[in-house]
Amino acid sequence: MRSKFEKFSLVLGGALIGILFTFNLPVFADKNNPNNLPIDKLRTFAEVFGKIKSDYVDQIGDPKLLDEALKGMLSGLDPHSVYLDKDKYKDLSQGTAGEFGGLGIEVGMKDGFVEVITPIEDTPAYNAGLKSGDLIIKLDDTLVKGLTLNDAVKLMRGKPGTSIDIRVLREDVVDPIDIKITRAQIKTKSVKAKLIEPDYAYLRVTQFQDRTGEDLAKAIKKLRKENKHAFNGIILDMRNNPGGLLTQAVSVSAAFLGDDELVVYTEGRAPDSKMRLTTAPENYIRPGGDFEKNNYIKSLPKDIKDVPMVVIINNGSASAAEIVTGALKDHKRATILGTRSFGKGSVQSILPMMNGSAIKLTTARYFTPNGTSIQGKGIEPDITVKDGTESLAYREEDIPDSLSNPQDKGKKDDKPVTNGPTPEQKEALKNFKPIKFGTDEDIQYVEALKILKGMGDQASMLKN
Protein backbone atom coordinates (compact mmCIF):
# COMPACT_ATOMS: atom_id res chain seq x y z
CA MET A 1 0.00 0.00 0.00
CA ARG A 2 1.23 3.51 -0.85
CA SER A 3 2.57 5.34 2.19
CA LYS A 4 1.41 8.82 3.07
CA PHE A 5 5.11 9.65 3.38
CA GLU A 6 5.14 9.71 -0.43
CA LYS A 7 2.30 12.21 -0.49
CA PHE A 8 3.31 14.80 2.06
CA SER A 9 5.96 15.92 4.46
CA LEU A 10 4.36 18.33 6.87
CA VAL A 11 5.88 20.10 9.82
CA LEU A 12 3.63 21.63 12.44
CA GLY A 13 6.01 23.14 14.95
CA GLY A 14 8.24 26.18 14.48
CA ALA A 15 11.50 25.64 12.63
CA LEU A 16 14.06 24.02 14.92
CA ILE A 17 16.95 26.36 14.15
CA GLY A 18 20.42 24.78 14.77
CA ILE A 19 20.26 25.88 18.40
CA LEU A 20 17.90 23.32 18.53
CA PHE A 21 17.01 26.02 13.35
CA THR A 22 18.47 35.80 -13.00
CA PHE A 23 15.22 37.60 -12.12
CA ASN A 24 12.73 37.97 -15.00
CA LEU A 25 9.40 39.81 -14.92
CA PRO A 26 6.58 38.97 -17.34
CA VAL A 27 5.83 41.79 -19.77
CA PHE A 28 2.21 40.90 -20.43
CA ALA A 29 -0.90 39.82 -18.60
CA ASP A 30 -4.06 38.08 -19.66
CA LYS A 31 -6.94 40.06 -18.15
CA ASN A 32 -9.14 36.98 -18.26
CA ASN A 33 -6.77 35.04 -15.99
CA PRO A 34 -6.99 36.26 -12.36
CA ASN A 35 -3.86 34.28 -11.44
CA ASN A 36 -1.50 36.36 -13.60
CA LEU A 37 0.86 38.71 -11.78
CA PRO A 38 -0.33 42.34 -11.67
CA ILE A 39 1.87 44.42 -14.00
CA ASP A 40 1.53 47.64 -11.98
CA LYS A 41 2.72 45.96 -8.79
CA LEU A 42 5.64 44.34 -10.60
CA ARG A 43 6.67 47.70 -12.04
CA THR A 44 6.56 49.17 -8.53
CA PHE A 45 8.68 46.28 -7.23
CA ALA A 46 11.25 46.85 -9.98
CA GLU A 47 11.22 50.59 -9.25
CA VAL A 48 11.79 50.07 -5.50
CA PHE A 49 14.53 47.55 -6.28
CA GLY A 50 16.24 50.10 -8.52
CA LYS A 51 15.97 52.90 -5.94
CA ILE A 52 17.56 50.71 -3.26
CA LYS A 53 20.35 49.76 -5.66
CA SER A 54 21.10 53.37 -6.60
CA ASP A 55 20.31 55.39 -3.45
CA TYR A 56 20.68 53.21 -0.34
CA VAL A 57 23.46 54.42 1.95
CA ASP A 58 25.42 51.14 1.65
CA GLN A 59 25.94 49.04 -1.44
CA ILE A 60 23.78 45.91 -1.27
CA GLY A 61 24.23 42.94 -3.59
CA ASP A 62 21.36 41.69 -5.73
CA PRO A 63 21.24 38.21 -4.08
CA LYS A 64 20.78 39.71 -0.60
CA LEU A 65 18.07 42.10 -1.78
CA LEU A 66 16.15 39.33 -3.49
CA ASP A 67 16.53 37.00 -0.49
CA GLU A 68 15.14 39.70 1.79
CA ALA A 69 12.24 40.23 -0.62
CA LEU A 70 11.45 36.52 -0.45
CA LYS A 71 11.62 36.57 3.35
CA GLY A 72 9.27 39.54 3.48
CA MET A 73 6.82 37.92 1.08
CA LEU A 74 6.58 34.80 3.27
CA SER A 75 6.65 36.50 6.67
CA GLY A 76 3.86 38.85 5.59
CA LEU A 77 1.47 35.90 5.24
CA ASP A 78 1.43 34.59 8.82
CA PRO A 79 3.92 33.93 11.64
CA HIS A 80 4.64 30.35 10.55
CA SER A 81 5.37 30.83 6.83
CA VAL A 82 9.09 31.48 6.30
CA TYR A 83 11.79 31.40 3.65
CA LEU A 84 14.56 28.91 4.50
CA ASP A 85 17.94 29.54 2.92
CA LYS A 86 20.24 26.55 2.43
CA ASP A 87 21.62 26.70 5.98
CA LYS A 88 18.22 27.03 7.63
CA TYR A 89 16.80 24.22 5.51
CA LYS A 90 19.68 21.98 6.60
CA ASP A 91 19.11 22.96 10.24
CA LEU A 92 15.43 22.11 9.99
CA SER A 93 16.22 18.67 8.56
CA GLN A 94 18.69 18.03 11.39
CA GLY A 95 16.12 19.19 13.96
CA THR A 96 13.48 16.71 12.85
CA ALA A 97 16.15 13.99 12.85
CA GLY A 98 16.81 14.82 16.51
CA GLU A 99 20.45 15.96 16.44
CA PHE A 100 21.96 19.43 16.12
CA GLY A 101 24.50 21.70 17.75
CA GLY A 102 23.98 24.72 19.97
CA LEU A 103 21.82 25.77 22.91
CA GLY A 104 18.58 23.81 22.48
CA ILE A 105 15.90 26.40 21.76
CA GLU A 106 13.29 26.88 19.09
CA VAL A 107 13.37 30.52 17.99
CA GLY A 108 11.67 33.08 15.78
CA MET A 109 11.74 36.85 15.25
CA LYS A 110 9.49 39.38 17.00
CA ASP A 111 9.82 43.17 16.88
CA GLY A 112 13.39 42.85 15.63
CA PHE A 113 14.49 40.59 18.49
CA VAL A 114 15.01 36.83 18.70
CA GLU A 115 12.03 35.28 20.43
CA VAL A 116 12.25 32.03 22.36
CA ILE A 117 9.38 29.86 21.15
CA THR A 118 10.26 26.82 23.27
CA PRO A 119 13.35 25.73 25.20
CA ILE A 120 13.84 22.02 24.52
CA GLU A 121 13.83 19.86 27.61
CA ASP A 122 17.17 18.74 29.07
CA THR A 123 19.22 21.12 26.91
CA PRO A 124 21.52 23.95 28.10
CA ALA A 125 18.89 26.62 27.35
CA TYR A 126 16.19 24.75 29.26
CA ASN A 127 18.42 24.08 32.25
CA ALA A 128 19.54 27.73 32.33
CA GLY A 129 15.94 28.86 32.75
CA LEU A 130 15.03 30.37 29.35
CA LYS A 131 11.24 30.61 28.95
CA SER A 132 8.81 30.63 26.04
CA GLY A 133 8.16 34.26 25.08
CA ASP A 134 11.56 35.55 26.25
CA LEU A 135 13.01 38.13 23.84
CA ILE A 136 16.77 37.85 23.34
CA ILE A 137 18.14 41.40 23.01
CA LYS A 138 21.88 40.82 23.35
CA LEU A 139 24.31 38.00 22.53
CA ASP A 140 27.65 38.52 24.29
CA ASP A 141 28.55 42.10 23.23
CA THR A 142 26.32 42.15 20.13
CA LEU A 143 22.90 43.81 20.15
CA VAL A 144 20.31 41.63 18.42
CA LYS A 145 18.28 44.55 17.01
CA GLY A 146 19.12 44.81 13.31
CA LEU A 147 20.40 41.24 12.96
CA THR A 148 18.66 38.69 10.78
CA LEU A 149 17.51 35.51 12.48
CA ASN A 150 20.20 33.59 10.62
CA ASP A 151 22.91 36.00 11.83
CA ALA A 152 21.70 35.66 15.43
CA VAL A 153 21.65 31.88 15.13
CA LYS A 154 25.25 31.87 13.91
CA LEU A 155 26.28 33.87 16.98
CA MET A 156 24.54 31.40 19.27
CA ARG A 157 26.28 28.44 17.69
CA GLY A 158 29.76 27.43 18.70
CA LYS A 159 32.00 24.71 20.02
CA PRO A 160 30.47 22.51 22.70
CA GLY A 161 31.83 23.61 26.07
CA THR A 162 32.12 27.29 25.17
CA SER A 163 29.73 29.74 26.80
CA ILE A 164 27.63 32.68 25.65
CA ASP A 165 26.09 35.52 27.66
CA ILE A 166 22.48 36.17 26.71
CA ARG A 167 20.35 39.12 27.81
CA VAL A 168 16.58 38.66 27.62
CA LEU A 169 13.44 40.66 28.21
CA ARG A 170 10.74 38.71 30.01
CA GLU A 171 7.12 39.77 30.09
CA ASP A 172 6.11 41.38 33.40
CA VAL A 173 9.72 41.51 34.62
CA VAL A 174 10.96 45.12 34.59
CA ASP A 175 14.73 44.63 34.29
CA PRO A 176 16.53 42.63 31.59
CA ILE A 177 17.75 39.20 32.72
CA ASP A 178 21.33 38.08 32.05
CA ILE A 179 21.87 34.35 31.54
CA LYS A 180 25.12 32.49 30.83
CA ILE A 181 24.66 29.30 28.80
CA THR A 182 27.29 26.70 27.95
CA ARG A 183 26.92 25.33 24.43
CA ALA A 184 26.57 21.58 23.86
CA GLN A 185 26.05 19.05 21.13
CA ILE A 186 22.30 18.62 21.26
CA LYS A 187 20.86 15.16 20.82
CA THR A 188 17.22 15.30 21.66
CA LYS A 189 15.37 12.25 22.84
CA SER A 190 11.74 12.70 21.91
CA VAL A 191 10.37 9.89 24.12
CA LYS A 192 11.10 9.30 27.80
CA ALA A 193 9.43 6.59 29.82
CA LYS A 194 9.39 5.05 33.28
CA LEU A 195 7.29 2.95 35.60
CA ILE A 196 6.07 5.38 38.25
CA GLU A 197 5.27 2.42 40.46
CA PRO A 198 3.92 -1.05 39.69
CA ASP A 199 1.07 -0.88 37.13
CA TYR A 200 1.42 2.84 36.31
CA ALA A 201 3.42 4.05 33.31
CA TYR A 202 4.71 7.54 32.52
CA LEU A 203 5.34 8.43 28.87
CA ARG A 204 6.77 11.83 27.97
CA VAL A 205 6.85 12.99 24.33
CA THR A 206 8.96 16.16 23.99
CA GLN A 207 8.53 16.66 20.22
CA PHE A 208 7.51 14.73 17.11
CA GLN A 209 10.64 13.61 15.24
CA ASP A 210 10.83 11.11 12.41
CA ARG A 211 11.07 8.09 14.78
CA THR A 212 8.90 9.24 17.67
CA GLY A 213 6.17 6.67 17.00
CA GLU A 214 8.66 3.81 16.86
CA ASP A 215 10.45 5.02 19.99
CA LEU A 216 7.13 5.28 21.84
CA ALA A 217 6.19 1.72 20.85
CA LYS A 218 9.59 0.43 22.05
CA ALA A 219 9.21 2.30 25.35
CA ILE A 220 5.72 0.89 25.95
CA LYS A 221 6.84 -2.67 25.25
CA LYS A 222 9.88 -2.28 27.51
CA LEU A 223 7.78 -0.96 30.41
CA ARG A 224 5.14 -3.62 29.84
CA LYS A 225 7.79 -6.33 30.05
CA GLU A 226 9.14 -4.74 33.23
CA ASN A 227 5.63 -4.58 34.74
CA LYS A 228 4.90 -8.22 33.74
CA HIS A 229 1.19 -7.59 33.13
CA ALA A 230 -1.24 -4.93 31.85
CA PHE A 231 -0.99 -1.39 33.21
CA ASN A 232 -3.70 0.10 35.40
CA GLY A 233 -3.00 3.56 34.04
CA ILE A 234 -0.83 5.60 31.65
CA ILE A 235 0.21 9.25 31.88
CA LEU A 236 1.04 10.78 28.48
CA ASP A 237 2.91 14.04 29.10
CA MET A 238 3.12 16.48 26.17
CA ARG A 239 3.84 19.71 28.04
CA ASN A 240 6.16 22.14 26.23
CA ASN A 241 5.97 19.93 23.12
CA PRO A 242 6.24 22.40 20.18
CA GLY A 243 5.02 19.88 17.59
CA GLY A 244 6.86 18.34 14.66
CA LEU A 245 5.94 15.80 12.01
CA LEU A 246 2.28 15.19 11.30
CA THR A 247 2.87 11.53 10.46
CA GLN A 248 4.27 10.99 13.95
CA ALA A 249 1.28 12.68 15.58
CA VAL A 250 -0.87 10.13 13.74
CA SER A 251 1.46 7.33 14.85
CA VAL A 252 1.30 8.28 18.55
CA SER A 253 -2.49 8.58 18.34
CA ALA A 254 -2.68 5.15 16.69
CA ALA A 255 -0.93 3.58 19.68
CA PHE A 256 -3.98 4.32 21.86
CA LEU A 257 -6.95 4.43 19.45
CA GLY A 258 -8.76 1.69 17.55
CA ASP A 259 -8.28 0.69 13.91
CA ASP A 260 -9.17 3.28 11.27
CA GLU A 261 -10.29 5.90 13.78
CA LEU A 262 -10.07 9.50 12.57
CA VAL A 263 -7.14 11.43 14.06
CA VAL A 264 -7.33 14.72 12.18
CA TYR A 265 -8.53 16.21 8.93
CA THR A 266 -7.11 19.18 7.05
CA GLU A 267 -8.58 21.73 4.67
CA GLY A 268 -6.68 23.99 2.27
CA ARG A 269 -6.79 25.22 -1.32
CA ALA A 270 -4.29 22.79 -2.85
CA PRO A 271 -5.69 19.30 -3.60
CA ASP A 272 -2.96 17.60 -1.50
CA SER A 273 -3.84 19.78 1.49
CA LYS A 274 -7.27 18.17 1.88
CA MET A 275 -6.74 15.01 3.91
CA ARG A 276 -8.49 12.75 6.39
CA LEU A 277 -5.86 10.95 8.42
CA THR A 278 -6.91 7.88 10.37
CA THR A 279 -4.96 5.42 12.49
CA ALA A 280 -4.48 3.20 9.41
CA PRO A 281 -0.77 2.25 9.15
CA GLU A 282 -0.27 3.78 5.68
CA ASN A 283 -0.64 7.17 7.36
CA TYR A 284 2.54 6.79 9.43
CA ILE A 285 4.75 3.91 8.19
CA ARG A 286 7.72 4.87 6.02
CA PRO A 287 7.80 3.55 2.46
CA GLY A 288 10.07 0.63 1.63
CA GLY A 289 10.61 -2.79 3.18
CA ASP A 290 8.01 -5.16 4.54
CA PHE A 291 4.89 -3.10 5.32
CA GLU A 292 3.47 -5.53 7.89
CA LYS A 293 6.84 -6.10 9.53
CA ASN A 294 7.35 -2.34 9.86
CA ASN A 295 3.99 -1.82 11.57
CA TYR A 296 5.39 -1.11 15.04
CA ILE A 297 1.98 -0.03 16.40
CA LYS A 298 0.45 -3.42 15.52
CA SER A 299 3.11 -5.11 17.67
CA LEU A 300 1.88 -3.37 20.85
CA PRO A 301 -0.13 -5.37 23.42
CA LYS A 302 -3.82 -5.05 22.53
CA ASP A 303 -4.81 -3.97 26.05
CA ILE A 304 -2.83 -0.72 25.62
CA LYS A 305 -5.82 0.66 23.72
CA ASP A 306 -8.07 0.21 26.77
CA VAL A 307 -5.79 1.28 29.63
CA PRO A 308 -7.09 4.39 31.46
CA MET A 309 -5.11 7.46 30.38
CA VAL A 310 -4.44 11.01 31.53
CA VAL A 311 -2.82 13.41 29.06
CA ILE A 312 -0.99 16.41 30.56
CA ILE A 313 -0.78 19.62 28.48
CA ASN A 314 0.12 23.27 29.00
CA ASN A 315 0.48 26.47 26.98
CA GLY A 316 3.64 25.04 25.38
CA SER A 317 1.77 22.04 23.90
CA ALA A 318 1.41 23.02 20.25
CA SER A 319 0.35 21.79 16.81
CA ALA A 320 1.22 18.07 16.54
CA ALA A 321 0.85 17.73 20.33
CA GLU A 322 -2.58 19.35 20.03
CA ILE A 323 -3.55 16.96 17.24
CA VAL A 324 -2.86 13.98 19.51
CA THR A 325 -4.63 15.65 22.43
CA GLY A 326 -7.65 16.55 20.28
CA ALA A 327 -7.95 13.02 18.90
CA LEU A 328 -7.76 11.35 22.32
CA LYS A 329 -10.19 13.90 23.78
CA ASP A 330 -12.78 13.69 20.99
CA HIS A 331 -12.75 9.88 21.03
CA LYS A 332 -13.12 10.00 24.85
CA ARG A 333 -9.98 7.89 25.09
CA ALA A 334 -8.22 10.01 27.73
CA THR A 335 -8.80 12.61 30.41
CA ILE A 336 -6.97 15.85 29.60
CA LEU A 337 -5.31 17.63 32.55
CA GLY A 338 -3.27 20.81 32.92
CA THR A 339 -3.78 24.22 31.32
CA ARG A 340 -5.05 25.41 27.93
CA SER A 341 -2.77 24.44 25.04
CA PHE A 342 -0.98 26.80 22.61
CA GLY A 343 -3.65 26.99 19.91
CA LYS A 344 -1.81 26.36 16.62
CA GLY A 345 -4.35 24.93 14.23
CA SER A 346 -2.45 25.27 10.96
CA VAL A 347 -0.30 22.94 8.88
CA GLN A 348 2.98 23.91 7.22
CA SER A 349 4.49 22.13 4.22
CA ILE A 350 8.21 22.18 3.52
CA LEU A 351 8.56 22.93 -0.20
CA PRO A 352 12.14 22.57 -1.54
CA MET A 353 13.36 25.02 -4.18
CA MET A 354 15.68 24.22 -7.08
CA ASN A 355 18.62 26.19 -5.60
CA GLY A 356 18.72 24.12 -2.39
CA SER A 357 16.63 26.51 -0.31
CA ALA A 358 13.02 25.86 0.72
CA ILE A 359 9.89 27.57 1.94
CA LYS A 360 7.84 26.58 4.95
CA LEU A 361 4.35 27.52 3.81
CA THR A 362 1.05 27.34 5.65
CA THR A 363 -1.03 25.14 3.35
CA ALA A 364 -3.98 24.04 5.48
CA ARG A 365 -5.94 24.38 8.69
CA TYR A 366 -6.53 21.24 10.70
CA PHE A 367 -9.61 20.09 12.59
CA THR A 368 -10.06 17.58 15.40
CA PRO A 369 -12.25 14.50 14.75
CA ASN A 370 -15.34 16.35 16.04
CA GLY A 371 -14.72 19.16 13.53
CA THR A 372 -13.21 21.72 15.91
CA SER A 373 -10.55 24.21 14.87
CA ILE A 374 -8.26 25.05 17.78
CA GLN A 375 -6.54 27.90 15.89
CA GLY A 376 -5.96 30.76 18.33
CA LYS A 377 -8.02 29.00 21.01
CA GLY A 378 -6.15 25.89 22.09
CA ILE A 379 -7.63 22.85 23.81
CA GLU A 380 -9.18 23.32 27.22
CA PRO A 381 -8.31 20.50 29.65
CA ASP A 382 -11.06 18.41 31.22
CA ILE A 383 -9.40 19.12 34.57
CA THR A 384 -7.52 22.40 35.05
CA VAL A 385 -4.43 22.09 37.24
CA LYS A 386 -2.11 25.10 37.22
CA ASP A 387 1.60 24.86 37.93
CA GLY A 388 2.16 28.46 39.07
CA THR A 389 3.54 29.73 35.75
CA GLU A 390 0.27 30.63 34.00
CA SER A 391 1.13 34.33 34.18
CA LEU A 392 4.04 33.57 31.81
CA ALA A 393 1.78 31.76 29.35
CA TYR A 394 2.47 32.57 25.70
CA ARG A 395 0.12 31.29 23.00
CA GLU A 396 -0.76 31.59 19.30
CA GLU A 397 -3.26 34.36 20.07
CA ASP A 398 -0.36 36.48 21.40
CA ILE A 399 1.51 36.38 18.08
CA PRO A 400 0.79 39.38 15.81
CA ASP A 401 -0.91 38.57 12.48
CA SER A 402 -1.68 34.97 13.39
CA LEU A 403 -4.30 33.18 11.30
CA SER A 404 -7.95 33.64 12.11
CA ASN A 405 -10.11 30.78 13.33
CA PRO A 406 -12.53 29.86 10.50
CA GLN A 407 -15.24 29.04 13.04
CA ASP A 408 -15.17 32.59 14.47
CA LYS A 409 -16.71 34.28 11.42
CA GLY A 410 -19.49 36.60 12.47
CA LYS A 411 -18.71 36.12 16.15
CA LYS A 412 -17.32 38.77 18.43
CA ASP A 413 -13.84 38.23 19.79
CA ASP A 414 -14.13 36.18 22.98
CA LYS A 415 -10.45 35.37 23.24
CA PRO A 416 -9.55 33.88 26.63
CA VAL A 417 -7.78 36.33 28.90
CA THR A 418 -4.62 35.43 30.82
CA ASN A 419 -4.33 37.36 34.08
CA GLY A 420 -1.02 39.07 34.79
CA PRO A 421 1.13 38.17 37.78
CA THR A 422 0.80 39.72 41.22
CA PRO A 423 3.76 41.79 42.56
CA GLU A 424 4.85 38.75 44.59
CA GLN A 425 4.72 36.56 41.49
CA LYS A 426 6.75 39.11 39.50
CA GLU A 427 9.51 38.92 42.08
CA ALA A 428 9.42 35.12 42.06
CA LEU A 429 9.59 35.02 38.26
CA LYS A 430 12.97 36.77 38.24
CA ASN A 431 14.53 33.62 39.66
CA PHE A 432 12.24 31.18 37.87
CA LYS A 433 13.68 27.73 37.25
CA PRO A 434 11.81 25.15 35.18
CA ILE A 435 9.95 22.37 36.95
CA LYS A 436 11.44 18.93 36.48
CA PHE A 437 8.58 17.07 34.86
CA GLY A 438 7.61 13.66 36.18
CA THR A 439 8.85 14.21 39.74
CA ASP A 440 7.17 14.71 43.11
CA GLU A 441 7.65 18.50 42.77
CA ASP A 442 5.52 18.42 39.59
CA ILE A 443 1.97 19.28 40.75
CA GLN A 444 0.27 18.31 37.49
CA TYR A 445 2.04 14.95 37.34
CA VAL A 446 1.13 14.16 40.96
CA GLU A 447 -2.51 15.06 40.32
CA ALA A 448 -2.61 12.96 37.13
CA LEU A 449 -1.45 9.90 39.08
CA LYS A 450 -4.12 10.49 41.74
CA ILE A 451 -6.81 10.64 39.05
CA LEU A 452 -5.59 7.41 37.44
CA LYS A 453 -5.67 5.62 40.77
CA GLY A 454 -9.18 6.97 41.35
CA MET A 455 -10.24 5.52 38.00
CA GLY A 456 -8.82 2.17 39.06
CA ASP A 457 -10.71 2.27 42.36
CA GLN A 458 -13.98 3.02 40.53
CA ALA A 459 -13.40 0.14 38.12
CA SER A 460 -12.77 -2.23 41.04
CA MET A 461 -15.99 -1.13 42.76
CA LEU A 462 -18.00 -1.73 39.58
CA LYS A 463 -16.57 -5.25 39.27
CA ASN A 464 -17.46 -6.15 42.88
Where are these regions (language model features)?
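C-terminal "post-core" interaction segments
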Residues: R2-S9, G18, V191-N464
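Flexible, low-complexity junctional segments that flank or bridge functional domains
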Residues: M1-I234, N240-G244, A255-G258, N419-N464
